[in-house]
Regions:
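Extracytoplasmic beta-rich ectodomain segments of secreted or membrane-anchored proteins
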Residues: 151-188
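N-terminal secretory signal peptides that target proteins for export/translocation
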Residues: 1-16
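Local alpha-helix boundary/kink/capping signal
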Residues: 25-28, 263
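Acidic, serine/threonine-rich low-complexity disordered tracts
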Residues: 39-127, 173-291
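Internal, conserved structured core segments that host functional sites
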Residues: 112-160
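Sec-dependent N-terminal signal peptides
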Residues: 16-26
Length: 291
């Protein structure tokens, strides 16, 4: 196998830009990526990130999706006690098609900054495969880093698209079907799978949403770009205490994260929605359409 040619240095492990502001809470806002999707449903969500019960960050995400296209954007910032020792903010966005019963991303962009250090990523995809990439800053080469081969960059999702679950068909979205999947993520530096398994269904209530949530257990499975000898990689690979709670986005077949819980070495990291404002958007009918 050969390493895929890139427009930037070979992807490597994520730097400390506050973990690009803690994953996808730390995301979004680049909406000028090619024109709006034809939206049948829209979600405006706000989240808070805590570790061991201590607030570290807040963020917001907007999703618009129709039958054939979707776009996701969001932003986040460091808050709480962490602001006394660190600063950080980030924006990210993704857009793509809905085809073959799944999300097929086309573009992804991330801009993050922490303590004066910037991190950027730009991915362009076609038919689920990576075509172009720019990532800054590059990391120093490491002999034990698993190389990223072209074969593992097929049928991938960017981190924003991978944070949402698409349930095809017309059946009940609030069922075990929401968890019956493995999510293949590539963030420009690492390729990994998130294997979901159904656990249970809970009742939740937050501003804008009151109803059921499907709870999935999650296993982190590194594929490429990681360093197997690193303790954090070993810890996360063996971590059996990761879960995501999913709720439906009105007017779509998308499921959004209500809560993400990850056991860490310093306490449980909890990303939880403080509001989930979801609405169905009626299609516009031309004035000359048949009546």
């Amino acid at each position: 196998m050969t390493t895929i040619p890139m427009t930037a240095p070979l992807p490597r492990s994520r730097p400390r830009a506050t973990a690009a502001i803690a994953g996808i809470l730390m995301a979004a806002g680049l909406t000028a990526l090619a024109g709006p999707a034809r939206a049948d449903g829209k979600l405006n969500a706000k989240y808070v990130l805590t570790v061991g019960g201590v607030e570290l960050g807040r963020g917001s995400i907007t999703v618009e999706a129709g039958d054939q296209a979707y776009e996701i954007s969001g932003s986040a910032r460091v808050t709480g006690v962490l602001r006394a020792v660190s600063s950080g903010k980030g924006v990210a966005a993704a857009r793509g098609a809905i085809s073959g019963g799944k999300l097929v991303p086309k573009v992804y962009a991330l801009n993050a900054e922490a303590d004066g250090k910037a991190e950027t990523a730009r991915l362009a995809m076609a038919s689920g495969a990576l075509k172009e990439m720019e990532v800054e800053p590059p990391l120093k080469p490491a002999a034990d880093r698993v190389p990223i081969e072209q074969s593992v960059l097929q049928n991938i999702l960017d981190p924003m698209s991978g944070a949402f679950v698409y349930v095809p068909g017309t059946g009940d979205m609030l069922s075990a079907a929401a968890c019956a999947r493995s999510i293949p993520v590539f963030d420009g530096r690492q390729r990994y799978d998130l294997a979901l398994t159904y656990q249970r269904t809970e009742t939740v209530k937050v501003a804008g949403y009151a109803g059921s949530a499907v709870v999935c257990s999650v296993r982190y499975q590194p594929v490429a770009g990681h360093r197997p000898s690193r303790y954090t990689v070993k810890y996360m690979t063996e971590n059996k205490d990761i879960s995501v709670w999913l709720v439906p986005v009105a007017g779509t077949r998308l499921m959004a994260p209500f809560r993400v819980s990850v056991a860490t070495m310093i306490g449980t990291a909890l990303l939880e929605a403080t509001s989930l404002e979801s609405e169905v958007k009626a299609s516009t009918v031309p004035v000359n359409a048949p009546r």
